[in-house]
Amino acid sequence: MNKTTSQEILKTNNCLEWLFEKIFKQLVPNKQELYDLPFSEIYSRTFCNSQIHQLIAESLKSTVIEIETYLTDKKFIEKFLFVSVRREYKFRIKKLHVQIMLKEYDKIEFLINSGYKVDFDSLKLACLNGSLDILNLLLKFYQKKLSSELLMYCSEFSHYDIYQLLTTKYNLYPNLSVFYRAVLSDSIEIVEDVSSNISANQQVMENAFKTNHTDIINLLLIRAKKDGTHIDRNLVVYPIMNCNFELLTILSNMNLIDWHVELYYSALLSGSMEMITYLEDKIDKINPDFHKKKILDSSHQSSGKNSLLLEDIIYEIDGKKYFSHTMNYAIQSGSVNVVDYIWSRGYGITVSNFITAIKQGSVEILERLCKWYHLKLPIYLIHYFSTKSYVTNKIAKAKVLIENKLLMINEPVQECIELYKKEETHIKLIEQPTQIVSDSKYDPDYLMQYSMFFIPMKGFKLNHRLITQIRINLQLNYMDSLVELYTRDRNYADKMILLNNLFLFGTIDQIKILYPLLKTKYCPDKPILMEIICKCEITKLCYLKNNRLLDNDVVQSLIPLVIMLENPLINALFSKLTTVNLIDKYIVLSNNVTLIRKWLNESPVIDKNQIKSLFLLDDTKITDSILSKYSVTICKHKEEFLDWCQEEDLLDTRQKIEKKYLK
């Protein structure tokens, strides 16, 4: 973490913080993760993530180093966790917990001495984060009986020193739940201790095989054999996928492998030609010529399966139909060499393989498929590049398909009922709520929630295809196609799609050329305008202003956001459009400490709820200013403020109120 305060390089930047809050909530959708994972994992995923720095820098036309310095500053992180997280998640994260996450020993000691109570979550966080010195400090002030649950957290993340302390000095004993977590670690010392008293069951063994720590798995296998515990032979898929030949040898010597042709799928997922060759040697002995016979692609159609989707996965050789499973597994391996090899063995390619490559493959793999496939792809594949489809390198992949003339997004389409049904089926599949794979979480469409900007207009069906078609053309700057698309006659809903897309994804040069083609004086929807303001896209705002597209009602509706962001450039622009009168409640909501301090110097009239909101900023100067200037209000409601401060974990503020008003 950066110890230089962010204010030395950038003053409080509400635009940056607004963007980061939105992104943080997408990357940490469940607040409980803050209490279930070491903070180092949250930190590397969010505050110290180069992809996030790059995205925000591009959005704000800033430099990556400025964004990185701002987000990795300890002072900012501390404020973000205590102030922003509780606001965004409606969740009270305690001040003591924040300092434990940040491993600030001196601050923790100060807070405890100031009256902050050590609870079970405090101990849990110290165990998760591997802070032995902090745990020792906390244990001095923890009055309740300790629970073996603490062993789960230090075991899972390999903190053997903490495990030793809790089992020896505090006599905590591991149970089966601890065993489940221990085998997820790389600490053989912890696993050895736990397994000496508890027999491994099937779940324990599977957890261990997933982590691929050979020494730990071997230890468990030996003890399982000694205890007579059944070992599932299907566990062999893990060492195959993890390319662990040493573990395969151990399993083979223990006669725990039944070789069969379906294991070849796992070999493909390993991405290793060495493992693929190894499996081929084993399978050929029991199933000669399995490649030539296409055994892996000879699945039978399951009853009740959607025939619309089945058509996308079928290919034909010598009059016989096959299902392109093998190529799909090869694509999921992420290895171009594996994809090349499977193609060389005579396996077919289908539309399904292109969908898999878009979702889980690389640009290079997609280029390979284009080289071998010579049919036009159905237009409904365009939806896998929509704002609701979260994939990596989305626009680069679209470019590959378009420039290889396989996906003709700008050619007229012969509409029919069958195409409509297929298109609707794929849209529903894409929009199904599923767990997003790790890499896809960094798709800007996911992080920035762009799909929220396109909702059906009353009386119209949302034109999904048009939204994605325009967006791709804008981002690839296909101006000839764009000019043609923007000059067509459209209904009102589709015109708004063109307009909103243009201002959300287009450049100012594209706007200057394309907006006049719409032959309208429409203004983008308010959410689009708010996004433009938050990203400080001044040139777009100037275009709207100069073309008189921002009427007074629209401008007035945007003033609260302008006040909250407190950006000098945006303020200057809006001051030319209207008189920006600072509205008290929006100044408070801005959380901009500099603006609020300046505002408080004018001694505005504020009520007790606004005082509470300002206390939540946890800024010493603001707190002291309020206590000095609003003594009548605070004194009148002092009991309420004292209880509220206790509830909100603002004990230092509570102590100041007690000292000043309870003499």
Curated annotation (Swiss-Prot):
Q: Which UniProt keywords apply?
A: ANK repeat, Repeat
* Entry-linked Gene3D superfamilies: Ankyrin repeat-containing domain (1.25.40.20)
Q: Which InterPro entries match?
A: Ankyrin_rpt-contain_sf, SecEffector_AnkRepeat
ANK repeats, residue ranges: 91-118, 119-148, 200-229, 258-288, 322-351
SUPFAM superfamilies in alphabetical order: Ankyrin repeat
Repeat found in the keyword field: yes
Asked if Repeat is a keyword of the record, the answer is yes
* Highest taxon above the source species: Viruses
Name-wise, this protein is Putative ankyrin repeat protein R219
Q: Which organism is it from?
A: Acanthamoeba polyphaga mimivirus
